[in-house]
A protein has these predicted regions:
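Solvent-exposed loop/turn segments at secondary-structure junctions
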Residues: 47, 99-103, 137-141
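"Short basic amphipathic alpha-helical interaction patches in structured regions
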Residues: 52-53, 108-113
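Glycine-rich portal/gate segments that line the openings of hydrophobic small-molecule binding cavities
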Residues: 61-110
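Solvent-exposed loop and beta-edge segments used for protein-protein assembly and interaction
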Residues: 31, 88, 124-126
């Protein structure tokens, strides 16, 4: 907490004081360098384009709002904003402000929430490993009250979804490490100039630095 800017510290404290769910998971070792993962995390528009090429679902699209914030949207009722509030090599903290519309993940009511995500990742003897922790507060006391009958369901679905997302991120990062050139042509075909620029900055014009 001491490393955070005052406004971010206040936002984190607000979430912790209204806490509904906590979650943590370790990601198994993957054959990817920390430097490659940092490149991808620094370029969310590129990461989303690579995610789509890997045919992971949902098909996420991202739009960068600033150097530290971006939106995530699957265009089907799952959307949010991610704000990076602390960064150092191998460690990032985000505040996520998201919403899942009714029925999008078989949820019986629309769910809005704010979440603190702390992700620590490092190169171990068998590859890049990670430890993810999240703290989630539903958007309102009324929503918390209305969701009580479904609380265990909402928590379970959130945990399954986060584990799935980070497993796919790890797999995609591993593929980007070994075959970056495979992404070059599909990203050009999509035609997003930002993603193309970010790919060339990270991996070279044809994925061969």
């Amino acid at each position: 907490m001491d490393a955070l800017a005052p406004q971010h510290r206040a936002a984190v404290q607000d979430i912790l004081e209204r806490l509904d769910f906590t979650f943590q998971i370790r990601t198994p070792p993957k054959q990817v360098r920390l430097a490659t993962v940092e490149k991808l995390y620094d370029r969310p528009r590129l990461s989303a384009a690579m995610w789509r090429f890997c045919q992971f679902v949902p098909r996420f699209h991202t739009f960068e709002l600033s150097d530290t914030a971006f939106t995530v949207d699957d265009l089907k009722g799952l959307h949010g904003t991610m704000t990076l509030i602390h960064k150092q090599p191998g460690y990032r903290i985000y505040i996520a402000d998201g919403r899942v519309e009714k029925g999008r993940m078989n949820n019986p009511i629309a769910v809005g929430a704010k979440m603190v995500t702390a992700y620590h990742y490092w190169e171990g003897p068998h590859g890049l490993e990670g430890h993810l922790q999240t703290w989630t507060a539903l958007d309102s006391a009324l929503l918390g009250f209305l969701s009580r009958p479904f609380r265990s369901y909402i928590q379970r679905r959130q945990e399954e979804f986060i584990a799935y997302i980070f497993s796919n991120i790890a797999q995609g990062s591993e593929f980007a490490e070994s075959h970056p050139q495979e992404f070059a042509e599909p990203i050009r075909r999509e035609g997003d100039p930002v993603a193309i620029r970010q790919f060339e900055a990270a991996f070279g014009k044809n994925g061969k630095h």
